[in-house]
Amino acid sequence: MSLDQFVTGWTLARFEGKADPQPRVFEQWIEFSTPFSNLPLVQLGLVGFDIDNRDTARLKVRAERITANGFMLVLETWRHTRVYGAEVSWLAIGT
């Protein structure tokens, strides 16, 4: 799944000119094509990214609020880092 600065709500490329210690977060709900009977295990992988080369690259990727129907994909950066895009793969395992 590819996400970038043209997706509504993307704030990871925004930098106001000071090293704000507060993280910038982007969330995207991922709906499973078929619901699981039980809570699945969700594995994420960062496949690629587009990050400004002027500063240190900082990017966290995690799954939150996992249900039988889907999960919230969360991308987070902080300080000077500007993230213009990220590609994430995911796998949900369960019954």
Question: Where are the regions a protein language model picked out?
Answer:
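Extracellular receptor-binding modules and their adjoining Ser/Thr/Gly/Asp/Asn-rich linkers
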Residues: 1-38, 47-52, 57-60, 64-95
